[in-house]
Amino acid sequence: MTTFNAKPDFSLFLQALSWEIDDQAGIEVRNDLLREVGRGMAGRLQPPLCNTIHQLQIELNALLGMINWGYVKLELLAEEQAMRIVHEDLPQVGSAGEPSGTWLAPVLEGLYGRWITSQPGAFGDYVVTRDVDAEDLNSVPTQTIILYMRTRSNSN
């Protein structure tokens, strides 16, 4: 009997799992679940404390490289009191997600949320908005853009 030392490929399993989660639980529950998965991943793979955005970007790219999950560019938006996170090359689970190929994007929201709130000077009360950048609506976006910003207080 011949044995091969190939790494298992979970892509078929993940694609079928993504369809079942979407069908059984719905998009909102799926997104909440995947955000929690992202937070859990961030707890196991933490960057050191960083004093600058540039240093944090380098450390996050090193962590993303370890799991082959693309790379990130961080930008502070002073007027909006926000951080713009542009993630490139998110792994795809087939065509799952809206838009197609972005099923894992909520994982990034949880991952970056936990990574960023662990840094000096970060605030814990934040909201995340996500957008995807696609030149052609029929193509798979190459970027996932996340804005991390302080929650506005209702009391003024």
From Swiss-Prot:
Claim: Iron is one of the keywords in the record: no
Pathway terms, separated by semicolons: Glycan metabolism; bacterial cellulose biosynthesis
Keyword Ribonucleoprotein: no
GO terms under biological process: cellulose biosynthetic process
Pfam families noted in UniProt: Cellsynth_D
Keyword terms of this UniProt record: Cellulose biosynthesis
Its biological purpose: May have a major role in the perfection of crystallization, involved either in the pore structure itself or in the organization of the pores within the linear array of terminal synthesizing complexes (TCs).
Name by which UniProt lists this protein: Cellulose synthase operon protein D
Organism, as annotated: Komagataeibacter xylinus (Gluconacetobacter xylinus)
Gene name per UniProt: bcsDI
